[in-house]
């Protein structure tokens, strides 16, 4: 099944197998619909995954699918990327990394320490209200945060992000703010291949892309795969792009 989608201002075509849609995604969509009706308020669901697993694409596809399934309640996909700390903040702050070295936040942008977790918690709590404040988004053109740019309108809010189920530091316990959680896993080797290819497609040389993976992306991948809390639904991404219930 193909869908023309837009994520972070970029258009692309997402493709999922018919069997994956019928056996995994439609049942998930209908379960969220049932939960929302049962609780009779805005439902918040998390879709967490390591970098490179395709969580943003999957969340956008789920929104698209919900609009084309008459018996489903339409959902809205939103990302936690809008809760990156602004570049000005990153440039002025540092943290101690996994090797015990103090590093500038900007050099590790995308690591768990470079997000406004308190702001995300507040936004999740507010999202249950009848008139929630708009969410910030992340511009892939400016490579920075755009404040209060996404109105929250639908009865089901599907929040996607790397660290939503991270079981350490300020992230621990964030899942308590969700009604339902999904974790999408993938083999580290597959994620490495996809992330390096993404960097090369963005203009980096293969050598630069591999170096960035070792210095940044790979560390984030390992952290999410090893240190995530159990989800209500665990999915696995195959090398062929297939989805299965783990």
Task: Put a short name on every predicted segment.
Residues 26-38:
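Pre-Walker A adenine-sensing motif
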Residues 76, 83-139:
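Conserved nucleotide-sensing/catalytic segment adjacent to the nucleotide-binding pocket
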Residues 145-148, 169-172, 197-246:
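Small-molecule kinase domains that catalyze NTP-dependent phosphoryl transfer to phosphate-bearing small molecules
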Residues 55:
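Conserved lysine of the Walker
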Residues 1-24:
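Charged, amphipathic alpha-helical linker segments immediately N-terminal to NTP-binding catalytic cores
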Residues 52:
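Walker A (P-loop) phosphate-binding loop of P-loop NTPases
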Residues 58:
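Hydrophobic positions on the alpha1 helix immediately C-terminal to the Walker A/P-loop
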Residues 142-198:
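ATP-dependent NMP and nucleoside kinases share a basic, alpha-helical "lid"
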